[in-house]
Amino acid sequence: VRGPLTKEQLEKMGYIVPDIYGDPAILLPLIYNPNVEKKYKYSVIPQFVVEKDFRERFHAENIISMNTNNYKQVIDNIKASEIVFTSSLHGIILAESYNVPAVFFRGLSKSVDFKYYDYYLSTGRPDIKIADTFEEAKKMSPLSIPDLTKLQQGLLDSFPYDLWEYKFWNKWQ
């Protein structure tokens, strides 16, 4: 599960949930991690549901769209940034997974969901700083980037490789 808040909710429903946290996106650097030179002072990743409105209202140096299938381009642009300002949960997760500082802002959506707190708690950061606007975010310092190694290893160790091999690979052999 993503974090302790999800675990708590599932346990209330009667499920047994191990203390293994992490969004699968934290594993991407283990799969795709090119060397990319920094070329942007900052980049902005708006939450996908407000991206169009954000682009119309703000002129940022580099706006990265999460509305794409080209994950390599997204990652390359994040890695090319000195810092990321984002209202997207996966903008935060990807930036931090690639050791790029991220500042979280509510943006046009104005909501802060359970899932954001769940992610931050999974990384050992109960006190998060949230900017209300992009302009406010640019004045803030990012939180320290967490060491995601233990979370990554927990996800890898808990993967049901035996089921994967049996159900999927044996069908095509």
What spans do the regions from the language model cover?
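Active-site anion-handling motifs in enzyme catalytic cores
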Residues: 1-173
